[in-house]
Amino acid sequence: MLIQDYLDICDPVLTFDRFMGGIELEKYLKNIPQHYTGRLRYDPVSMLKTVLFGFMENGYISLRELEDQCKVNLCFMYLMDHQTPSYRTFGYFINEVLADSIEEIFQDINKKIFETEHVDLQHLYIDGSKFEANANKYSWVWKKSTEKSRYRVFDKITTLFAEINEELTCTGIKLCINSEYAPEYLKEAAEQYAEAWQIDETAFVHGRGHRKTTQQRHYEKLREYAAKLEEYVEKIKICGEDRNSYSKTDHSATFMRIKTDYMGNDQLLPAYNVQVGVADEYIAVVDVNQYRSDMDCFVPLMNKFYTTYGFYPKYPVADAGYGSYNNYIFCEQHGIEKYMKFTMFKKETTDMKYHKDPFRAVNFPIGEDGIMRCPNGKNFYLQYRKNVKGNKYGRQEEVYQCEDCSGCPYAEQCKKTDKNRTVRINRELTAMHQEVIENLESIQGALLRMNRSIQAEGTFGIMKNDRWYKRIVRRGIKSVLLEVFLVSIGHNLYKYHNKQKKVATAA
């Protein structure tokens, strides 16, 4: 009897095999190197199917588990036609063959699912979750700490240069004293110093009972500081402009505060920020970021969606972690409706006392003369405009100050200091917040919010609790992205099979 004769008609492997039969898999396998000696290679199409089915069936499957399943599991035997590749073979296939084509495979599988299931891509439910990286917990490197250490070394170099210049007065050589120094300059200074005193490193003394000469001490200090500066430059370069930390055992991982605090000390852990956009329970777009905040991940995710599908979703629905001025402006520029909550959304919509508080600056009336007035009728005049840090679109806050708060009967309710009250206002952002409230408080908005909590958060719930994928296994941003794509493909195929099974059962 054939293996398929032992399988149930609704077995996931049969659904998977029928589905993959409609996709041209050979085009992803063109880069496999040709070997003309040794044993015959395994069929790459069967290998690809086996890997994808493993992630569909298990959520995440290790290389050792793939090897074992091919020996004992009928489903894997059916796909591999009784062949049993080793875990090394699977590892080579995933890392060398699939690494460059995995995103295209994800897109083509999604395209077929979405056409079959008539998935609505105009409504995209967005959420992010931090997955702990495969890195040591106490392997952090902090960018600010590194910069402080570097400036302390700069001060030591300045002191050392002053001593050396005094020593080299008779030779006519003078080292330039600056506020900052490059490692290359220190190496040149060490060479000049060695040449001036004709230093022979083989004559250096070390250890107890030996006294170093002034020239040896200065020369060794120059070499030591140059090495230190090179180390600091490398650390700052690895961090980049957008990160404040990284792990020594996985340079791509950033230290973040994650919800699962199993250490019980509120400790930052190395992690990746995984973002998904879900449409009709399927992962339509997925991205891996090194940002700690979801706010910075919205635009890259939308651009990735556009690159994949050729348009932006009309209704991206997200929680309060995504509502920022930058993201709202991006939505306006690309014809996207604003359905992302902002930080104070819940308080604005549920606490009417706070929302209508007459002492909030946004509720101060503005007269026909354009002057803002407080409940006591005092005028507020513009003092200056201030650029908001980290803003991409030139956002400015207007700072107003009351003309005179002395003797005000509402002083205790209105202000906390003895000075005239100062308020900061961004009318454009306030108008955006009001638009978001109107969108999300409508009947359509309420349905979209409910669906987001079910679909987007539910996707991570299925990944972590039902399919036991709670931690990143690979290291390096490229390898992590490969892993997340495999998990996402497995999730979508798992969902597709369940829906097909429901239809077959109902029929």
Where are these regions (language model features)?
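Basic, short loop/linker segments at the boundary and entry of helix-turn-helix/winged-helix-like folds
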Residues: 9-49, 55, 427
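Long, acidic, intrinsically disordered low-complexity segments
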Residues: 1-9
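Anion-binding and metal-coordination hotspots
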Residues: 51, 59-72, 83-507
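A general alpha-helix detector
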Residues: 2, 46-52, 89
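Short arginine-rich
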Residues: 77-81
